[in-house]
């Protein structure tokens, strides 16, 4: 991680679809999905570039068609950061829905009790420009891997 370029992650709206107490799981991929698989990975760091171990990275999103599961926990779950502040969770690139570009909601629960609520966006989406919540510093860095795509996103929180 290049500490010289760190900026605090943007605080963005939770939206109406958050559900408390999701399951802990490192893959949100459903067996019959037709979506593009992506591993979202990165670090939780303080503004002075120190890793945050044991942070809970809570993720929820629409499926590949742009629909949220409001009755169960499909495309909802969390992972914990390791001793180096690293997290990794497998999912699919979510679909758009009216007024919103592709995005993944995230709450980062710090051991101190502080919470960062934000959203992660994907590059190259024409709908980014028309989404009123879209924030450029929450744009994932995408790369291709042997099994699909990787979205690199570091979460930088106040000390």
Spans of model-derived segments:
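Beta-strand-dominated extracellular/periplasmic modules and repeats
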Residues: 1-159
């Amino acid at each position: 991680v290049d500490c010289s370029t760190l900026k605090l992650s943007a605080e963005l709206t939770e939206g109406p679809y958050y559900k408390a107490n999701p399951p802990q799981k490192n893959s949100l991929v459903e067996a019959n999905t037709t979506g593009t698989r992506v591993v979202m990975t990165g670090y939780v760091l303080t503004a002075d570039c120190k890793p945050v171990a044991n942070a809970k990275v809570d993720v929820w999103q629409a499926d590949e068609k742009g629909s949220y599961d409001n009755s169960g926990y499909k495309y909802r779950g969390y992972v914990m950061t390791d001793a180096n502040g690293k997290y990794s969770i497998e999912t699919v690139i979510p679909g758009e829905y009216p007024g919103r570009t592709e995005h993944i909601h995230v709450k980062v629960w710090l051991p101190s009790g502080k919470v960062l609520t934000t959203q992660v966006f994907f590059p190259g989406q024409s709908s980014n420009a028309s989404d009123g919540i879209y924030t450029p510093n929450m744009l994932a860095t995408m790369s291709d891997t042997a099994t699909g795509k990787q979205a690199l996103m570091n979460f930088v929180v106040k000390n």
